[in-house]
Amino acid sequence: MKNLTIFSWGYWGWGSCAAQFVKAADAVEASRGYEPLLFVDVRLQRSVRAANFIGGAFKELVGEKRYRWMNKLGNMAVADRSLGKVTIKEPREAESLLDLASECDKENRRVL
């Protein structure tokens, strides 16, 4: 089995500069011989203050074909601080993320 690469990334500090981030990430991927990234959003909720990440704003920025919201991989402790630690909503959903990364690999595309 081939190794898959899935990158993690936090949007903190990129709220008003998301377009520049996407442009830079695409340039890096192209320089390494890859197609543009698929962005997977694992936030439980998308109600934030960061301008380009409120609701579906980031999806609108990158386009529907380059964005997936997988909130089942979100941290329940964001909504319920009494949990006190990271608690993934549906850990088994990680398998869907791996399946998606495998499909992207066939297209010479990586996942962030």
PLM features: residue spans?
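Residues lining hydrophobic/aromatic ligand-binding pockets adjacent to catalytic sites
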Residues: 1-112
